[in-house]
C-alpha cells in the first residue's frame, strides 16, 4: 500500500516525513528558539500543510485572499483511521469516497491512478491508509 501511495503521487501533497530544525534554531524573526525537546525530531504527518485546489466542487469559499479562496490545506493523514468524516467539509465517509473527490492540481492524477488499480491493489492502499 505504501508503494502505491507513492506511485499514485499521493505523497506529493501528503508528504510522509519531515525532520524538525535543529535545537536552538531562531524562529519567528528572533522571537523564539526551538527547544532541545523539539529539535531534529522526525515526524510522519503525511501532509505538506500547504494550500491546494483539489477541485472539491462544493462551492465552499474559504476565508482568505482571492488567490486561495478555492483552496484547502492538506490535512495530516496520521490517525486518519480514527476520523468519522473526511475531506475539508466532512462529506466523505470512506477512503474511497475521499479519493474520488480529489481533482485539480495533482488530485485528478491520483484519483485516476486509484480508479485504474485492481481490487486487490485498492484494498492494499486502503489498508495502508488505515495503518496511519
Stretches found by the model and what they are:
Residues 2-132:
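Periplasmic c-type cytochrome electron-transfer domains
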Amino acid at each position: 500500500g505504501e508503494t502505491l501511495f507513492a506511485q499514485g503521487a499521493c505523497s506529493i501533497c501528503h508528504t510522509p516525513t519531515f525532520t524538525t530544525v535543529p535545537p536552538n534554531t531562531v524562529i519567528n524573526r528572533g522571537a523564539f528558539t526551538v527547544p532541545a525537546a523539539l529539535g531534529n525530531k522526525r515526524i510522519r504527518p503525511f501532509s505538506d500543510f500547504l494550500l491546494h485546489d483539489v477541485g472539491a466542487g462544493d462551492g465552499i469559499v474559504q476565508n482568505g485572499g482571492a488567490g486561495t479562496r478555492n483552496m484547502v490545506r492538506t490535512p495530516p493523514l496520521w490517525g486518519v483511521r480514527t476520523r468519522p468524516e473526511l475531506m475539508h467539509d466532512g462529506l466523505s465517509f470512506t477512503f474511497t469516497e475521499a479519493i474520488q473527490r480529489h481533482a485539480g492540481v495533482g488530485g485528478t492524477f491520483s484519483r485516476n491512478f486509484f480508479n485504474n488499480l485492481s481490487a486487490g491493489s485498492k484494498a492494499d492502499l486502503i489498508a495502508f491508509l488505515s495503518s496511519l
